UniProtKB/Swiss-Prot annotation:
Residues the record lists as binding ATP: 34-41
UniProt name for this protein: Cytochrome c biogenesis ATP-binding export protein CcmA
Leading EC class: translocase
Gene Ontology BP terms: cytochrome complex assembly
Task performed by this protein: Part of the ABC transporter complex CcmAB involved in the biogenesis of c-type cytochromes; once thought to export heme, this seems not to be the case, but its exact role is uncertain. Responsible for energy coupling to the transport system.
PANTHER family xref list: ABC TRANSPORTER I FAMILY MEMBER 1
SUPFAM superfamilies: P-loop containing nucleoside triphosphate hydrolases
Assigned keywords, A-Z: ATP-binding, Cell inner membrane, Cell membrane, Cytochrome c-type biogenesis, Membrane, Nucleotide-binding, Translocase, Transport
Any one Gene Ontology molecular-function term assigned to this protein's record: ATP binding
Gene: ccmA
Organism: Ruegeria sp. (strain TM1040) (Silicibacter sp.)
Family per similarity comment: Belongs to the ABC transporter superfamily. CcmA exporter (TC 3.A.1.107) family.
S-S pairs: none
ABC transporter domain ranges (all copies): 2-204
Record membrane topology: Peripheral membrane protein
Length: 204
């Protein structure tokens, strides 16, 4: 689904990571682990093709990717249901009703997104992933603003996505109880040795 070879990325014109290598297939999840400022967001943005790599290559179809950033990116004047219907039409993707049920948004579906709490907006933002029809989810701290119950809803959506042959790459500090692999990113510096993902079941 995606393969990364000797990838280097930069932030503000300065190299932050180099020699990043991994491959990910359908049904697999990968979490990026490292201290704040190491370059996790920069790496995710590069993998999502939102910025060019400094070096190396990314193999895989960009049209397979759905990206969820720190910002929720919801349309505040549209209702919850209208937001999901909009994105479903844009991506020719899945059924908004399924996403609404998965993230427990039934009682909120007719409420404008601008009237939602921070946690509710985050649930709506993550529900969008389900209507894109994209196989590879790239997620930057997806559980921000979520309470414990909502984290479990998100974890369930990830499990369902993986079970259906999808894949996920994410930066998160929350244990989602999902078996996956971890890619350790070393201390901030311009050059890093090759980074190999290791099995660490239950971390995700």
């Amino acid at each position: 689904m995606i393969e990364v070879r000797d990838l280097g990325v930069s932030r503000g014109g300065l190299p932050v990571l180099a020699g990043v290598n991994f491959a990910l297939s359908g049904g697999e999840a990968l979490v990026l682990r490292g201290p704040n400022g190491i370059g996790k967001t920069t790496l995710l943005r590069t993998l999502a093709r939102l910025q060019l790599p400094l070096a190396g290559e990314i193999l895989g179809d960009a049209e397979d990717i759905a990206y969820a950033a720190h910002a929720d990116g919801v349309k505040l004047t549209l209702t919850v249901a209208e937001n999901l219907s909009f994105w479903s039409r844009v991506f020719a993707g899945g059924d908004p009703a399924v996403a609404i049920a998965a993230f427990n948004l039934d009682a909120l579906q007719h409420r404008p997104a601008g009237g939602l709490s921070a946690g509710q907006k985050r649930r709506l933002s993550l529900a969008r992933l389900m209507v894109t029809g994209r196989r590879l989810w790239i997620l930057d701290e997806p559980t921000v603003s979520l309470d414990a119950a909502s984290v479990q809803l998100f974890a369930s959506s990830i499990r369902a996505h993986l079970a259906s042959g999808g894949a996920a790459i994410m930066a998160t500090h929350i244990d989602l109880g999902i078996e996956g692999r971890v890619l350790d990113l070393g201390p901030f510096k311009a050059k890093l040795p090759a980074l190999d993902a290791e099995d660490l079941g239950g971390f995700l």
